[in-house]
A protein has these predicted regions:
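An acidic/polar, Gly/Ser/Thr-rich interaction patch typically located in mid-to-C-terminal regions
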Residues: 46-77, 210-211, 215-305
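Charged- and aromatic-enriched interaction segments used to assemble
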Residues: 109-224
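Extracytoplasmic/secreted envelope proteins and their assembly/folding machinery
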Residues: 98, 142-146, 183-187, 232, ...
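Generic structural motif
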Residues: 11, 44-46, 159, 164, ...
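Assembly/oligomerization scaffold segments
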Residues: 1-116, 288, 292
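Residues in well-ordered beta-strands of folded domains
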Residues: 12, 62, 85, 102, ...
Length: 305
């Protein structure tokens, strides 16, 4: 029976673009797909990338042997809202991705037809929203970021000031003027004033490059808990000695991990690496029908740019 299988993945694909659904899903039809490793359910694979700062690297979702009709419909849709939820049958299933579908492809592999959805969180909102701004001379960088996020805003994206940790730098006498997309405006500001921004689960985040982890629940990856698979230091190749500046961690799939937030390592084999780190890059690699069910983390020591 299907309920004997522990891994579970749900994929929901809306008929409407993500940036047109800020008021909810009313008026949209949704295709819901499910896989759990059993032969009578779909095989679903995904590689989900989450970065801090935003690098606009698409994630991919692969679904095996969809109907010809559904494959045809997916080929016509661009910008559709996509949600992925995953977890274990004996624990709550967690939403791990919300974003826009950029495009879909189909290929035959042996007896299977594989549909690949390429998706990106916040892509539609950040690219569709136009930004024309001139700041006041006494405005701070954080003031302007919040102003951009509120007007023109990012449709469908949640903005909470507590997720924006930027120093109160002033523009001074020169002010600041920009015309373009919201994404380009934020990229220009971040490159000049030393902060990173990203969108995860349709929530906006920004942090100074030296601010450390954003406030929130720290996730522990531990030998004792059985979720740690591998941990290796990231070393700078200094002329006189190798100096650790971060860590790479491979764990069992851990949906609570978030880019920009803290992860704590508790390794019995490498206790010298045990401490808290700031997650820079995070990738979830999962497959309902193979051994792949992991999370891969690149994280920095606090204070490392």
């Amino acid at each position: 029976m299907a309920d004997n299988f522990l891994r579970q993945v749900y994929v929901a694909i809306s008929s409407l673009p993500e940036w047109k659904m800020s008021g909810g899903d009313a008026g949209a039809s949704t295709v819901k797909l499910f896989g759990d490793g059993s032969f009578d359910q779909l095989r679903i694979k995904f590689t989900l990338h989450k970065q801090q700062p935003d690098a606009a690297i698409p994630s991919s979702i692969q679904i095996y042997n969809l109907s010809k009709e559904l494959r045809g419909e997916l080929s016509k849709v661009s910008g559709a809202k996509v949600k992925v939820s995953a977890g274990w049958a004996n624990a709550p299933v967690v939403e791990v991705f919300t974003g826009s579908m950029l495009y879909a492809t189909h290929q035959r592999e042996g007896a299977d037809i594989i549909t690949s959805l390429f998706v990106l969180s916040g892509w539609g909102s950040a690219h569709q929203a136009a930004c024309i701004k001139t700041s006041a001379q006494d405005a701070t960088v954080k003031d302007l970021v919040l102003e951009i996020l509120n007007d023109p805003g990012l449709p469908g994206i949640t903005v909470d000031p507590k997720n924006i940790v930027i120093a109160d730098q002033s523009f001074g006498n020169q002010g600041w003027t920009f015309a373009g997309s919201v994404r380009d405006a934020l990229n220009k500001l971040s490159s000049i004033y030393g902060f990173s921004w990203w969108i995860d689960q349709n929530v906006f985040y920004a942090s100074d490059d030296t601010a450390g982890a954003l406030p929130g629940g720290e996730v522990v990856i531990s030998s004792k808990e059985g979720n740690l698979l591998r941990a290796e230091p990231m070393l700078s190749l200094a002329p006189d000695r190798n100096q650790q500046y971060g860590i790479t961690i491979t764990s069992l799939f851990e949906p609570r991990l978030k880019a920009g937030f803290s992860v704590k390592l508790e390794s019995e084999l490498n206790p010298q690496l045990n401490r808290s780190y700031v997650i820079l890059n995070l990738t979830h690699v999962c497959d309902t029908h193979s051994d792949a069910w992991i999370s891969q983390v690149e994280a920095l020591l606090y204070g490392v740019v």
